[in-house]
Structures are given as structure tokens and as C-alpha cells.
């Protein structure tokens, strides 16, 4: 490829609204062009990288037995009604009408679509298992699109679905796909982790995320420093904590505690640890057609993890869509006083009460007395009936691993893949069934598997690039080598550059010849910005001594290559990371 023919509209400066280096570099280097909020055009350089990512993905998925299909981007809203997700998914789901007043959605995920295909065409256990996948455009109407391709509204996704006759078969395919994803991300040269995760709006009994470690990541994962335990902070667990020694011994009584509203101040007032204080957190619960209040109790030195709290509500049948902060007006309307909320008589004030599981059989506790400036001491939860307990706390770095007691540590990460065991939920709601070996009708066991193809462009750059521009991995760079001529007006340099270019092409090297009549410094700046893996300099040194300066983009390390071994050395360098 000649640079003069390459459509790569580089910019002098990155977009002013770009925060992440991946967004800055992709826009400035001419990879992407923004159409609207969270919507991007992929220009030739980006398309080359996308094609490489997609080819690796196709190869690994098909090696593991998955079959490639292409489903409609537009889906009937009635299918989403049947699954119950039309309302549950929220405003991120874009719904529209056609000219005949039929309702459709632009699909962010395709569980409904693929389940309908299975319901119509898979009739017998003899056709199972089957794993179908696609790489296609998706749309999610994000409320705050940001960070370029990391949180875009329109994006490219690899999503797959598997159908099984029983849970055992699903378990095998879940692990099979996990292996395929590990191979894909390894081929892409990424440092990643597999973590236990929440299933979110997709649902299911078990899910794992594939996350790339990067300080710009939107997610926090909790990783054990001693074993392989890793989980998204939204579902991370810990081992049982030892109880502090200074237990506040007291009979149940009410004490005046003026202006003492935080767990820390209550603990200091009673000369004990926040561990023994019941911290009450009241949230507004958003349902499909109403709003209610829920109160969550955790120990005073813990914080609420809202994803866990929302899941706990739905386990007890709340059908909650989201949680929001309850403001002072909400509390006043419910007859509650911030800072003095406790379990006694609370049921008449809120619709749901959930205690963290660490409080089971808790005694010697201090709690709000549901009266201004008063707390109750000597609270014993064993004296209450029908309390609901669940894991609802956010793990701290001072906590210990639930598997080995090792130290837990936070890492910032960016999710690039997710696999789910969906079970029979979608099959039942969409009446997708088959006949088993006994001739009885059974619902499919389903798995769901996704990789963010376009997000991977950003993930690679966030992990690998530097302040100068793009640094790609071995299998993702848009070009292997760019040949940079020191003085394009020197006919001898120009002639040698074309000769070297042809030699590299014959060896299968994806080479770019910078044939522009531009300053040498400007050409090298574009090399740093675009991120070809190597830059080969053709100048006076090459003409006079038959030696070429070669620069690795990854670390800007320089090497001198003799003309007689040029192709051999370049192939060696390209074969290494």
C-alpha cells in the first residue's frame, strides 16, 4: 500500500471531548470519525484492525464447533414482550414503529431472536447440542455515551447462543466457549482475567466476564493475591470476618444520641467499633408501574453493593428494575428520620427490609430507634421473626478471599467478553421446546456468549499504547512495516525504497510505503500516531553502507539491519511480540 493512496485523515490534535487515550489516538490517527453521540464511522485503518480481530474470532469459534450465522438487526417488539424484557430493559432499548404501525426494536442483544429460530427448527434431541454465533452491529441507547468505542451506542458485537437437552451438556459448552474466548484474547495479545460476574438484564444462573486490566477501566474487579479467585465487585464475596474483641455488652435499652447520625459517630459515642452498629440504607425501588422503599441493613464498617441489593430484592419477588437514592422528602413521607433508622417497627414504613448475611444471629448491636436523636443498644436480631438475609455488601480490600483467606485487591478493568448460563428462562417464555429421547416435550437449556469486537480496539490501545499514539499487538496492527524515506526528492532513496517495498511484499509482509513528499519528522510522527509495528528508514545510510535503521513501535527501540539479511530479520521481529 502506498501512503499517498491510503485514506487516513490524521488530525493535528485529538477531539477536545476525548478523555481516554484510545479515543484520542483512534480519532487523531484517522481510524474513526464520530457521526453523533456514541456513533462512529470506521475508516480504512480501523476496518483493517477490525477484520483481524474478527478473523481470529471466527477461527477460534469454529475450531470449538460453533457455526456462523447472521441475524436481523431489527427485531419484532412482540418477541421482547413475550420474554418480559421489553419493559425490564428500560430506555436503553430503542423501540420504533414502521409505516404500518408495527413495533420493532434495534437489538442490543438477540436472545429472543435466536430462541425463536430454535423453536421453529430444532425439534429433536438428536439435533442437539448446537452453538450458533454472529458478528454484527448492535445498538444500545446509552444515557451517557462516553470514552469513544468503550461506551458507544452503536457497536459491533460477537454474540453466540447454544441449545442443549440438559444442564450437563450446557455446562460442557460453557467451559468449551470459555476456552475459545481465552484463545481469542490470548491471540490478540491482551493481559486479561476471567471473573465471576452478575448476569444483569440478560439473566441466567451463572456468568463470567473476560476483563482487560487497565487503569481506565469502568469496572472494578476483586482478585485474590494467593489463589485464582477473581470476581466483579458487583458479586464478589469474602470469608467470614472475626468479631472485634470490645463487644458492647448491654440489655436492650434506648439512649439519647443527639446529632449522632453516622455509623462512625455512633460507634465513637458508645466507645465501640462500627462493626457493631446497624447501618440503615433506604433506597427508592423503581418497578414497572410504581415506586416503593426498601431498607438495607449492613454493619457500620460496610457499604452497600447496589447490584447485590437489587438482585436480593428480585429473589424475594420484588420485580425491581433499578434502585435510586431516597431523598429527604421520601423519608419524611414514610415517617423515617435519617440517621436514626432501625429495625423496630420498620415494616410499617417501607415495603422491603433486607439484612446482610453477615448479620445473621447478630446480637449486641446498636441501631437507630426510629426516633430523632435516639439509638437502641443491645439489639439482638434473633428476636425478630422472618428476617430476610442476603449478601449485599461491597467487598473491601481489607477483606479476605472466600476460598483461601488470602488478601483481596482491587483492579480497574474493562469488560470485553461475557458468557452466561441462561437455563430455560427464554425457552419457557418463548415456548421453545424439543422432544427428548423418551418422546417427551422439554424446554431447551441455553447458553449465551458475547465479545465486544469494536470495544476491543479501545481495550488493546488502553493496555498497550503510549502518549505518542497507537501501539498495537502482534496480530492486530494495521500494517507490519512502514517504509519511511528520509528525502523523497532524492531519486536514489526513492528507487531503493520501492525495491525494498517489493522485496517485503514478496515475503508476505503487509508493508506501507510512505511515498508522500513531506518532512521526515512529520512522517515519523504519523508512524508513532498510527502504530505500524515497525518503521524501516531509507536514507543516506541505506544508500552508502547498505544498512537500514529499523524502529519497533512498541518500545521505540532501534536496530540496524544489513541489506543482505533484511527480510530475514524483519520476519524475525514480526514473529516476536
Curated annotation (Swiss-Prot):
For this chain's UniProt record, which GO biological process terms are given?
Answer: prolyl-tRNA aminoacylation
Q: What is a single Pfam family found in this protein's UniProt entry?
A: tRNA_edit
Major localization class: cytoplasm
Does the record bear Oxidoreductase in its keywords?
A: no
SUPFAM superfamilies associated with the record: Class II aaRS ABD-related, Class II aaRS and biotin synthetases, YbaK/ProRS associated domain
Q: Where in the cell is it found?
A: Cytoplasm
Subunit structure, as described in the record = Homodimer.
Family under the similarity heading: Belongs to the class-II aminoacyl-tRNA synthetase family. ProS type 1 subfamily.
Q: What is this protein called?
A: Proline--tRNA ligase
Q: Which organism does this record belong to?
A: Helicobacter pylori (strain G27)
**Lineage start:** Bacteria, Pseudomonadati, Campylobacterota, Epsilonproteobacteria, Campylobacterales
Q: Which gene encodes it?
A: proS
Amino acid at each position: 500500500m502506498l501512503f499517498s493512496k491510503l485514506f487516513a485523515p490524521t488530525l493535528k490534535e485529538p477531539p477536545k471531548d476525548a478523555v481516554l487515550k484510545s479515543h484520542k489516538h483512534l480519532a487523531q490517527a484517522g481510524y474513526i470519525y464520530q457521526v453523533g453521540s456514541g456513533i462512529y464511522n470506521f475508516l480504512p485503518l480501523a476496518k483493517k484492525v477490525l477484520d483481524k480481530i474478527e478473523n481470529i474470532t471466527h477461527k477460534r469459534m469454529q475450531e470449538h464447533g460453533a457455526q456462523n450465522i447472521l441475524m436481523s438487526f431489527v427485531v419484532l417488539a412482540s418477541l421482547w414482550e413475550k420474554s418480559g424484557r421489553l419493559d425490564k430493559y428500560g430506555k436503553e432499548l430503542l423501540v420504533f414503529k414502521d409505516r404500518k404501525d408495527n413495533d420493532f426494536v434495534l437489538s442490543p442483544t438477540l436472545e429472543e431472536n435466536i430462541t425463536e429460530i430454535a423453536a421453529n427448527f430444532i425439534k429433536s434431541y438428536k439435533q442437539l447440542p448446537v452453538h450458533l454465533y454472529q458478528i454484527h452491529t448492535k445498538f444500545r441507547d446509552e444515557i451517557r455515551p462516553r470514552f469513544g468505542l468503550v461506551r458507544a451506542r452503536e457497536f459491533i458485537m460477537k454474540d453466540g447462543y447454544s441449545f442443549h437437552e440438559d444442564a450437563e451438556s450446557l455446562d460442557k459448552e460453557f467451559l468449551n466457549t470459555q476456552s475459545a474466548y481465552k484463545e481469542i484474547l490470548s491471540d490478540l495479545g491482551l493481559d486479561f482475567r476471567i471473573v465471576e460476574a452478575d448476569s444483569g438484564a440478560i439473566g441466567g444462573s451463572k456468568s463470567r466476564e473476560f476483563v482487560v486490566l487497565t487503569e481506565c477501566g469502568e469496572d472494578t474487579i476483586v482478585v485474590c493475591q494467593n489463589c485464582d479467585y477473581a470476581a466483579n465487585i458487583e458479586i464478589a464475596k469474602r470469608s467470614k470476618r472475626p468479631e472485634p474483641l470490645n463487644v458492647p455488652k448491654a440489655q436492650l435499652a434506648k439512649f439519647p444520641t443527639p446529632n449522632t447520625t453516622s455509623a462512625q459517630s455512633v460507634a465513637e459515642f458508645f466507645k465501640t467499633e462500627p462493626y457493631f452498629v446497624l447501618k440503615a440504607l433506604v433506597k427508592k425501588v423503581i418497578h414497572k408501574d410504581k415506586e416503593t422503599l426498601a431498607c438495607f441493613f449492613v454493619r457500620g464498617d460496610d457499604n452497600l453493593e447496589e447490584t447485590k441489593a437489587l438482585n436480593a430484592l428480585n429473589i424475594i419477588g420484588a420485580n425491581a428494575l433499578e434502585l435510586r437514592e431516597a431523598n429527604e422528602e421520601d423519608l419524611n413521607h414514610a415517617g423515617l428520620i435519617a440517621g436514626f433508622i432501625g429495625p423496630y417497627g420498620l415494616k410499617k414504613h417501607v415495603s422491603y427490609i433486607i439484612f446482610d448475611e453477615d448479620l445473621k444471629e447478630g446480637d449486641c448491636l446498636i441501631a437507630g430507634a426510629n426516633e430523632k436523636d435516639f439509638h437502641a443498644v443491645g439489639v439482638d436480631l434473633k428476636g425478630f421473626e422472618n428476617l430476610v438475609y442476603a449478601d449485599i455488601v461491597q467487598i473491601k480490600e481489607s477483606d479476605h478471599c472466600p476460598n483461601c483467606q488470602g488478601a483481596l485487591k482491587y483492579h480497574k478493568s474493562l469488560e470485553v467478553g461475557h458468557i452466561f448460563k441462561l437455563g430455560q428462562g427464554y425457552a419457557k417464555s418463548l415456548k421453545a421446546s424439543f422432544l427428548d429421547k423418551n418422546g417427551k416435550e422439554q424446554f431447551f437449556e441455553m447458553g449465551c456468549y458475547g465479545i465486544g469486537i469494536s470495544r476491543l480496539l479501545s481495550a488493546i490501545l488502553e493496555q498497550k499504547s503510549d502518549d505518542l499514539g497507537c501501539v498495537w499487538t502482534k496480530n492486530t496492527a494495521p500494517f507490519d512495516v512502514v517504509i519511511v524515506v528520509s528525502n523523497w526528492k532524492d531519486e536514489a532513496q526513492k528507487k531503493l525504497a520501492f525495491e525494498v517495498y517489493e522485496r517485503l511484499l514478496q515475503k508476505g509482509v503487509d508493508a506501507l510505503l510512505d511515498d508522500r513528499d513531506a518532512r521526515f519528522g512529520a512522517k515519523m510522527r504519523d508512524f508513532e500516531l498510527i502504530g505500524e509495528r515497525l518503521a524501516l528508514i531509507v536514507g543516506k545510510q541505506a544508500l552508502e553502507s547498505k544498512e537500514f535503521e529499523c524502529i519497533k513501535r512498541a518500545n521505540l527501540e532501534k536496530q540496524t539491519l544489513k541489506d543482505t539479511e533484511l527480510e530475514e530479520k524483519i520476519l524475525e521481529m514480526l514473529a516476536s511480540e
